[in-house]
Each structure stands twice: as C-alpha cells, then as structure tokens.
Amino acid sequence: TVNLYLRNSWYHNTIKEFIRRGEIGDLAIIRICHMTPGLAPGEGHEYEGPSFHDCGMHYVDISRWYAGCEYKTWHAQAIRMWDYPEPWWLQCHGTFENGVVFDITQGHVYGQLSKDQTHNSYIDVIGTKGIARMSHDFKTAVVELRGVNETHRIEKPYGGKNISTLCDLFADSVRTGVFNSRLPLMRDSAIASEYAWKFLDNARRNE
C-alpha cells in the first residue's frame, strides 16, 4: 500500500533529492494536506477502516519517509460528518524522534455536493534555509523548489498510481538478486497502519 504511488511519484522523489543535496538546510517541518470530495461513508472505505486509515496511512508513511525517523509525539483531532460514527476528516501534528515536526490533514469531506468539485492537496517541506513544496489536482502536479543555490518550478502530469514504477523496481530486484532500496519493507506498511490507527484513537480521546 505505501509504495503504490507516493514513494514512487516523480514529485516526492524530486523533492527528496533536493533535500539530499542540502538545498533547504536541515529538514525541520513537514506539512501535508490531502482533502478531496472522495468517497462518502458506505462507498468503499470501511473495508480497510475509516478514511484516515484507508487513505490517510499513505500520508503517515510519506511523512516518516521524509523524516527518516520514527514518530515520537502526536496530537490529533477529527470530526464526524453526517452523523456517521467514524471521523471522515482528521488533523494530526507532532514530532519525530529526530526533532522534525509534522502536520497531516486528511479528509474526504471537501464539498461532495458542490456543483463544481475541487481538491486541496499539497506538501510543504520546510528547512532551516529553504523550502520545497508540491500541489496537485490529480491531473497536473506542480513542484516549487527554493534552495540556497537553486530555484525551480516543475510542472508535469500527476502520474496516477505509478504501478509501472513499482513493477520496474521489483523486476530490478529479481533480475539483480539485490533488494532495490527504493522498495519499502513490509514493516513500513505495518508501521503506517499502526500509526494511522494510533492517530485515530488519539483523536477520539480529544475534544
């Protein structure tokens, strides 16, 4: 689950390479937002849990992927829409063990019945010297990189689920007999699932 499209996406890999080159200084803050009309309760998410587990665990994973560290503290709040027993919007902020701060907002409550539907999906990666950010509308992704030496604005097709990239990485591992480091471990999926549930549980405890 965690590798289908976010870890394989051109935009996240572009941002991570920019960070690796030291262009934003030390990584300090990761802000992710993914709000869409999405699926309403009863339309598919319940098989894998509430919206934040079924969909939100992708963002739990990608935040950890950027931080390169484990979650340390968190505080979550959520809202139940339409009198449904499970929350369909959740916001969680906290820290990683290395001091990096995170903020994840995810929900499928973004105007289901609006005449012209829209989305609000982005990531802000803030360092001690520069920033990298991305936004998309499921058709086009725009990456903006503002570092100490380089400034770029890259606009490309969004890329969908990137299953072809996943297949290529797996095939490379089979062909060479060496596990491709861009592939996650099963442990990564388990951790993403575990913390998505922890954040949901924390939200239930908070007003």
Locate the predicted segments by residue.
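C-terminal helix-rich "cap/oligomerization" subdomain common to oxidoreductases
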Residues: 97, 169-207
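Residue-level signal for the nucleotide or nucleotide-sugar donor/cofactor binding architecture
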Residues: 10, 54, 120, 161, ...
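Short catalytic-loop micro-motif centered on adjacent basic/acidic residues
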Residues: 1-3, 75, 183
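C-terminal "lid/loop" region of Rossmann-like NAD(P)-dependent oxidoreductases
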Residues: 150-159
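Short glycine-enriched, charge-decorated loop/helix-capping segments at active-site entrances
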Residues: 46-50
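Contiguous beta-strand/loop segments that form the cofactor/metal-binding neighborhood of enzyme cores
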Residues: 60-140, 157, 165-178
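A contiguous active-site-proximal alpha/beta segment in oxidoreductase catalytic domains
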Residues: 1-40
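A general structural signal for well-ordered alpha-helical segments in protein cores
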Residues: 12, 59-60, 163-171, 193-197
